[in-house]
Amino acid sequence: MSKGHSLQDPYLNTLRKERVPVSIYLVNGIKLQGQIESFDQFVILLKNTVSQMVYKHAISTVVPSRPVRLPTASEGEQPEPGNA
């Protein structure tokens, strides 16, 4: 896993697994709402009444509807060097 994805992937995966409704703000100001169905290095699949593939380079902010707890190192995640 590259260093740039050490926070992004677990965060998005937690939102996906817990089916947390999210608001995604795009760089042009548009707000999208739904649940994260899937994601990869370049896109997020957002499901509402329809599924939308949103390119990550177009995303400004991802806002969950409720607080989420990320897995800690003691729950199976390996800490990044220097972040322990």
Curated annotation (Swiss-Prot):
This is RNA-binding protein Hfq. GO terms for cellular component: cytosol. The gene is hfq. GO terms for biological process: regulation of DNA-templated transcription; regulation of RNA stability; regulation of translation, ncRNA-mediated. Residues 9-68 form the Sm domain. It comes from Azotobacter vinelandii (strain DJ / ATCC BAA-1303). It holds the Pfam family Hfq. Keywords: RNA-binding, Stress response. InterPro entries: Hfq (IPR005001), LSM_dom_sf (IPR010920), Sm (IPR047575).
